[in-house]
Amino acid sequence: MIQSFLKQVSTKPELIILVLMVMIIAMLIIPLPTYLVDFLIGLNIVLAILVFMGSFYIERILSFSTFPSVLLITTLFRLALSISTSRLILVDADAGKIITTFGQFVIGDSLAVGFVIFSIVTVVQFIVITKGSERVAEVAARFSLDGMPGKQMSIDADLKAGIIDAAGAKERRSILERESQLYGSFDGAMKFIKGDAIAGIIIIFVNLIGGISVGMSQHGMSLSGALSTYTILTIGDGLVSQIPALLISISAGFIVTRVNGDSDNMGRNIMSQIFGNPFVLIVTSALALAIGMLPGFPFFVFFLIAVTLTALFYYKKVVEKEKSLSESDSSGYTGTFDIDNSHDSSLAMIENLDAISSETVPLILLFAENKINANDMEGLIERIRSQFFIDYGVRLPTILYRTSNELKVDDIVLLINEVRADSFNIYFDKVCITDENGDIDALGIPVVSTSYNERVISWVDVSYTENLTNIDAKIKSAQDEFYHQLSQALLNNINEIFGIQETKNMLDQFENRYPDLLKEVFRHVTIQRISEVLQRLLGENISVRNLKLIMESLALWAPREKDVITLVEHVRASLSRYICSKIAVSGEIKVVMLSGYIEDAIRKGIRQTSGGSFLNMDIEVSDEVMETLAHALRELRNAKKNFVLLVSVDIRRFVKRLIDNRFKSILVISYAEIDEAYTINVLKTI
């Protein structure tokens, strides 16, 4: 029979709960022997500890969604157990070893001390923990219900924007509904704890007063004997009931005060957040030391605390820094291997391969060996990331730097996703001049010339800075020139750095300030199209920091225009003032215009399809137009004139694509992007 029952339990674990409920009902009616009461008291304590530990280690509130039901069952079990122990106390003046031991241990030689300790435990549970948890549950339930419509709308918006699919939306709605029901259940379930605490107090007085009366009238005890016996039993019974109740109350407090969204358990979150800020640790350490110096205070106690906090401070600042560096080293494998004609294998070996992420490292800079100082380079990279965000509104991923024995002293190589993307010649011990000046040769200043994107860069020793200032040469530091070249390389490959996930992260922050605007944009544009718009803007050196203006433009034009390329042109027109401010000099924009013949030739080559528009010119016409443009643009470049190409709005993107291979650094703008506050200086019409 037992074997059959165990087999049923293994397939139907709910039978355990059913048996427990039947046992609780039986405890209300049937008198129990003391040894069985001891077992049930021990079971009650262990169950309370089990619930306490379970609530402590949950990672989100839905991980313990059965807690209100568990709370009801444990409360009923505890009250039924109190009835059984009260029956034993009043009838036999004996409630088992556990209750007697608890009472004797707490009371000791003083009944007054025992009452005080028991009163403190009861007050802490009833007034502090239970009342606080009850209030938190009430507020959480109200806010959960009030926030449901907004959360439902957010799920619908994500579904329309293509961020989630129908299955994901269904799962989110299910989670939202379960959370709302759970918070509502908590609001009522906390009344169980409150009622249990009140019932426990009443049972204590009944056992004490009734026990003394029964002891004197039925058991022939003296007043002092009855008072001593029943006080020990009453306080012992109260403690074995209140301690599990206290653990359950704390468990309820843990769950209702937990904030959803954290991936770790509560203990880990508490430790990481309290001790996560090194500055707080060192300040607290100093204050602890100062308190220890006050007259009459035990200095050694506070000194020990201060030393512990200081040790934690150094652990955070030094050990974790080294740990982060080692983790960044192992985040991806950037090594190479060579295969030669020898018989020996030269395949690379990676230690602990399974622990390494399969993702590539987004950005790596390779320097020549013995060329970089770690502290200086970390500072420079952080300044580059900060300036790039200021200039273009994009947060770059962490940039790692490595050394290579294959590079020349002043060579730097940029790897994007561990593949070579660009290289630079930067002389960090010199200054650079970006415009050629004949007076430099006349002064006899030694110059090292390099080029980047058709720009000739002259590098001069720092000692000649004063001489260069006297001839009005445009001087730039090596760090600034490195940032300029690196930023251009990053923008040329922006599609690999800034994609849908980065766009989503940016829009999540934007939604906190402009939720209605973003909701309107998502009605007509998916996040994929928004990402493409931002990529195209960044690819032509246009900042996306003014995201509000970009979203306003998308909200205006997206309902009428489905072609992403055309949408970009409308966004560029809305950013005209910012585009002009970047290319103008003293309020003037120097431009080169295209003749009607060339514009018509390009316009005739545009083809419209369901997938969008593209340029498909005849080879002869394309070569003729390209040669004409190349010849004229090269002449202007040789004349050292800074200019942009000004064309009609309908062909701007196609002209940019046409000249991109030969003249990538030349900006192409349309008439719609000229702000009325700026004047146009036409250098030439091609």
From Swiss-Prot:
PROSITE patterns: FHIPEP
Location of the protein in the cell: Cell inner membrane
GO biological process: protein secretion
Pfam families: FHIPEP
Keyword Electron transport: no
Principal location listed in the UniProt entry: membrane
Transmembrane parts of this sequence: 28-52, 105-129, 197-216, 232-256, 274-292, 299-315
Keywords: Cell inner membrane, Cell membrane, Membrane, Plasmid, Protein transport, Transmembrane, Transmembrane helix, Transport, Virulence
GO annotations of cellular component type: plasma membrane
Topological category with respect to the lipid bilayer: Multi-pass membrane protein
Job of this protein: Necessary for the secretion of IPA invasins.
Family: Belongs to the FHIPEP (flagella/HR/invasion proteins export pore) family.
Protein name: Protein MxiA
Organism of origin: Shigella flexneri
Higher taxonomy: Bacteria, Pseudomonadati, Pseudomonadota, Gammaproteobacteria, Enterobacterales
Gene that encodes the chain: mxiA
